[in-house]
Amino acid sequence: MTEQIQPSETSPKSPEKPNKKHWVRKAVCIGSAVILVPVLGVAGALSFDAGQKSLIQLVDKMLDSFSVEQVEGGLQNGLVLKNVRYQTAGIETHIAQARLQLDFGCLFSREVCLRDFTLNKPTIAINTALLPPSAPDNSKSGSMKRISLPISINAENLVMQDLSVNIDQTSITLGNFKSAVSLNNEKGLTIAPTEINDISVIAKKLSEVKSEPKAEQPNKPVDWAAIEQSLTPAFLGNVSEIILPFDLHIPEISGKNWQYQAVNEKGETLQSVEMSSLIAQADTVDNQLQLQKLAVESSLGNLSSQGKLQLDGDMPLDLTLKSHLEPLKSDGKEILPASDVDLTLSGSLKKSTALSLKTKGVLDAELNGNVQLAQDKMPLNLTLNVAKGQYTFVNTMTPLKINDVTLKLTGDLLNYHAELKGDVAGMNYIPASQVELNADGKLYEVTVNKLGIDSLDGKSEFVGNANWKNGANWDIQADLEKMNIAFFVPVMPATLSGKLHSRGFAGSQGWQVEVPVADLNGMLSAKPISLKGSATLNQNVLLTVPDLQIKYGENYLKASGVLDDHSDFALDINAPNLRGLWSDLKGRVKGRVAISGQITTPNLDLDLTSSNLHLQGFQLAKASIKGHINNASLSSGKLNIKAEQLHYGGNIKLHLLDLDLSGDEQNHKLILKSQGEPVAANLQINGHFDRTLEQWKGTISQVKFETPIGDVKSNQAIAVSYDNKQTQANIASHCWQNTDVELCFPQAFNAGKQGNIPFQFKRVNLDLVNKLIEQNSLKGNLQVQGNVAWFTDKPFQFTANVDGNHLAFSQKLDYRTFKLYIPKLTLNADIQNNNLVLKTDINVHNQGRIVGDIHLNDLAKNRQLGGTLAIERLNLSIANQLLTSGESVNGEVVSKLSFGGNLEKPLLNGDFNIRNIRTKLKSMPVNITDGDIALRFNDNRSTLQGKIKTVDSHLNLTGRANWANIEHWTTELNAQANNFNVDIPSMAKLRFSPNITIKANPKELNLSGTVDIPWARIKIDSLPDTAEPVSEDEVILNGPHKSKEELIKREFAAKTKSGMEIRSDLRINIGKDVSLDAYGLKTNLDGLLSVKQDKGNLGLFGQINLTKGRYASFGQDLLIRKGLISFSGQATQPTLNIEAIRNPETMEDSKITAGVRVIGIADSPEVTIFSEPSKPQDQALSYLLTGRSLESSGEVGSTGSVGAALIGLGISKSGKLVGSIGEVFGIQDLNLGTSGVGDKSKVTVSGNITNRLQIKYGVGLFDGLAEVTLRYRLMPQLYFQSVSSTNQVFDLLYKFEF
């Protein structure tokens, strides 16, 4: 029992260890479950499509900033997400569709396989102002090391389409991106052939917002020591090799259609760059970087490059780059011409890198040299050779030109030595010069060992130094040898030699400019000229001149002294002969000027005289300035200026000028006397100045101005006061009087920052205007009352009331005089509160009245229009005084218009009518018996209706206009008539039916429509007998075209004077009843023509048929059997196809036809003589001229035929002359001609003694028999005729017409 009980006593303690192990084991199990269950759960969920979808939906619910509209598929076969949105502070993202496909089977081979990653229409908007501040990056970047990847990555299909990114005011779009990438330890990073197309970047540049000016911060001095320290270490430092994390393989990256645009707030393009093509190919193998190809084609130019770089060892380098730069333009102007640039880099980066740069274009240059990037301060040795270069920096200046320039630069970044040689010229102020420079320098200083310049027909040499370490310091010496300064001062072509020395400083501590030595001498206009002296300027003493002397021939100027708060400066001049010093300057000047006291209020002593001064258009016979002015406690002094015979140009001639000023502040007087043309003034001013109150008071008296319109005087002394504190003047009431004008200021007025001036023109005789324009056109008087006022806190005010009675205007036009009588005229103008009201009432010749009431509100900004304008029965008969006897114009103008809108967009309402138009003018082809034209205005548009009546026809006019947009106004006018009769004296009578439309806008004037001519009778007198044709080689010297060919080929105006392009498309239909009688041609016409004009080219198209025609040629009367004129472009170059035959009635054999064919271009047609049936040319010509053959040439008849033809050919040109002779003797229609055939031919003279009685006399050419014929018309178709010859015959004739 004991043994059994004993263990029971210890039972509570013995189980402690087993219980602890149990709880530990339990805790481990629970912790593992907490970690592994979610991981395994997520992994399990990602293994199935449903799990993947559930996880995405869970994230969508848990995150407010993330949402997905639709989820399809799974990662293994392709997970598709639609309308994915993500939003955070400053960033909004939207993806229309995303597809992601993974191959989980690749994980077993330690590879991540991304089969597809496609984004469609991703949109990203970023507002940088809302982005949270980024945390500072305190990490230090170490050297790059090779990376060993635990797993490979293979992305087969990476696609992005229609990407849109907006970052503040910059918009970026990407049309298409397609690529594939693989990354592993064996091959590194391989980017498969990649396409990046249709990139567009649009940057909007906002106008700068004016910010409040900030207090200026003192400029911190440049820390040159820090700059030197930063430039001292080698550029490559201790870089022994460049290690890439992995190899890189880029078979090809290509891009097409890339574009960059900078626009303003209105969307207007400020800058545009287009890159049409980009190709890049690169590779790294065995620590060698190879650029196989880089090619860029863009609007800026083309670039191509290739090369290689070893990334270890001495880093050998071999790189070539070639580019062609297109002309660079800004605001349509070329700022950089086209250029070619070739760059070659070779050598090694660790030792010496050689470079070669060649340019061609704006600069034809070659730069060669080497730099040592791995050495401290980067030692360099460069040579630049420029064959030629030219560039225009300022459009108004000549371009800068450099030629044969060589620059050698050796040393390093901190210490350098430069040698320069070359030629330079241009920029208007740089003469052709040869420059040679030898200098040493540092970052902050330069020492010029020698600067030689061969220019201006001489030489100059400079030595010295300049330093800008602490402000600016310089010390320069110059030696000049025979330098001609005519290039800079053409009117002073002096040749100078000598020495100049300048030194000084400028900085925060002050400034000083010192010229310790100035010793120049030379020749000017064959006289010696010299300058010797020294001068100093600084912030304490404005100017110190120990001694300065300038001599020119016998002329000299001497200056010495000090200008500061205690000035003591004297200037002496004695120039008895200034000829040759400056341009055409001549004359004599002598005197002295002394300045003492404080420079701001100096004391002056003046004693200068001159005589016979002449400079260009200025002439002065004699002048003097004498006086003393003391500006101590109380300003006082005396000054006298006199001048005699002062002439300038051909208009200003002052015979005498005398200005005398004397007194002090308390009591002073100014007297001005002058005589001359066109204006001379005489006046006296007495005044008093109170320095304490800063007020001046005085009177202007004895005022008289001699002007082209006569003497102008004041009616009294004028009291004037001025308050300097208030900037205000007060002028007492007074009047200005002239024989034609009297201007009065009826009450005292103020003028200053604000003022109020009432005025009154009591009388304005319009003869004053006649004197000014040197014509006698106006008569009458005007009266004007008004007031003008201006203020500091509101707009100015102005009122004027103009009244005129019995006004007249006359103007000679040729031999006539146009007179216009205006019995009464009133004009009232009022500007109040920035609004203008203009009222007018004009009675015109007691035959009409013009009444206006026009408002223009808000003059400063909107300028709103309002008011009315009425024209009451203005009679057009006013113009009859310009017409000849028997001519007249009648009608009346009636209008009532109202205005609205503003000046930029005016609105007009009302009517404008011209009624009862009647004209009878010799210069017009029609007389108007009644006509009306009515314009109707409705806001920003109008319509036109018109009707023009003649005795037997009428013309209709319609039209419309629109100016809703004043810059793009439109108008249209149509003219239409039916058988409108036109009578052109001594030329033509015709009936035509036009339907023509004219359209116009600011850019184009368009004429179109049709013109039908059903009936016309055109008769043009032939040229006079003595007229000779224009020679083929004649040129017109005073015309715009110089030869016949240019006249034919000339272009008509393509644009109007206002810039509108002229276009026309007009069809002309010539009817069947149109006849022409001109220059021996009698025929009927018909056809269709089209007139077209575009861009200055006037074209005529179509054809005209000649029917029933007769033509006098070769001394014969020819019948037109066939006539066709065709136009296919130039109106002066039609194609002719005309066939004219001899009248069969005059042929010996009526079965034979002889004639002329004219075929070809009018300028050079082919003319042939033909016969039917066909005969030799001599026979055909004989038939054409004589009507018979040449076969019986020995017969008398044949000889008579030839003689008759020759006589006929001669007298065919004399009809006009014979007719003129007949008129002298009272015989109408006297003409000379031939009749008969062969040896029966006669010469006949016929004419009308009265309208009924005709006489004809004929003489045989070969038989000499005379014949007299008298014919009397009893009735229109019945004649009595008597023929007296070898026999006496009486006939009674009746005429039939078929």
Curated annotation (Swiss-Prot):
Protein name per its UniProtKB record: Translocation and assembly module subunit TamB
What species is given as this protein's source? Haemophilus influenzae (strain ATCC 51907 / DSM 11121 / KW20 / Rd)
State the annotated membrane topology for this chain.
Answer: Single-pass membrane protein
**Sorted alphabetically, which keywords does the UniProt record give?**
Cell inner membrane, Cell membrane, Membrane, Signal-anchor, Transmembrane, Transmembrane helix
UniProt cross-references to PANTHER family, sorted A to Z: TRANSLOCATION AND ASSEMBLY MODULE SUBUNIT TAMB
| Ranges annotated as spanning the membrane | 28-48
Protein function: Component of the translocation and assembly module (TAM), which facilitates the insertion and assembly of specific beta-barrel proteins into the outer membrane. In addition, is involved in outer membrane lipid homeostasis. Likely transports phospholipids between the inner membrane and the outer membrane.
List the Cytoplasmic topological domains.
1-27
Could you give the subunit structure recorded for this chain?
Interacts with TamA to form the translocation and assembly module (TAM).
Compartments in which it is found: Cell inner membrane
Look up the signal peptide feature and give its range: none
| Family designation | Belongs to the TamB family.
User: Which BP terms does GO give this entry?
Assistant: protein secretion
Q: Which residues face the membrane's Periplasmic side? A: 49-1298
Q: Name one GO cellular component term.
A: TAM protein secretion complex
InterPro entries documented for this protein: TamB
> Where mainly located?
membrane
